[in-house]
Amino acid sequence: AGVSKADLLIAATSTQQVNILTCVIGKKLGVKKCIARISNSELLHRRDSFDYRSIGIDEVIYPETLGASEIKTLLKESAVSDSYAFDKGKLRLIGIKIDERSELKDKTLAETTYLNPDTSFTPVAIVRDIEDKIENETIIPRSHNILKQGDIAYFIAQSDNGVDTVLSLSGRENLQIKNIMIYGGSDLAYTSAKHLSKKYNVKLICEDLPKCEKFADELPNVMVLNGLGTDVDFLREEDLDSMDAFLALSNETEKNILASLAAKESGVKKTISQVENIEFVPLAHNMGLNTTINIKYLTANFIVNYIREGELLNFTSIEGLDADVIEVEVKEGSNVLDNKLKEIGFPKDGIIGGVLR
């Protein structure tokens, strides 16, 4: 397989022991860098006390921690469907669905400039549902493009005032979240419940009785219940309609979508659904479930950022958006210095969302 000539080995099977052993063997055969996926969060926390490089592992990934961190951000910024920070949060990429409340609806980007007098935000992408097509269309917007009802619009916004301006124009505000219901017996559900219970009141619904007993023992601050996440009557008996957020985090995409729809019908204002099958993302969005999470995407972003460290400051690929977001540093000697974009051959299907100076 030529492993001795490889610059990078990524061991990301579902079996932790196989991944660790693969990296150990790979390093001995001459691989320059090795990344191992782990399934035990305790190993992640030991990075400060144990030198993984001594056994041939340069970096460890625990995807569920990446997912739990993403969920924490999405709950904090509950008015948006996506949120990513750049340069320690000075700029943010946010996604918002355009509905009847939005002042941006039915306006071209040129017509919205008066709503953005201090240029605190820039529209950078539009995801639109196209009738009779399974996949949504991604548009890199220009001044003539119109924002339509049902679009998911992505903005690069200044954190200090741009984000609030976009939320205000969209008729949205962040919710004060206190009570959360989580459905699922997955590692992501467990990890999320563990982290979120430090700040919120958390109920965890799990269909597997042995897992329920295990979770109840290990998560003292979480109310663990045995039941079906798609049983609406059961969920309502457990006060679904009084929840501020519902997280469908089982390993079954279809059940997550159904459970989130039930939560939405019951009046829960914020839902987050784990969607393992990428082809289901447009379907979920078209059904009104705008906030989805896919830990494969998060893991891929982590790996790309690791590989490109030094070349890119940040790389982000967003599920459902047929475009990538990159953050780069303009270095001395670069061809773009002191030149206009039209003079440097900047891609027509690209856009600069912001400049940090």
Where are these regions (language model features)?
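Cytosolic regulatory regions of ion transport systems
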Residues: 1-357
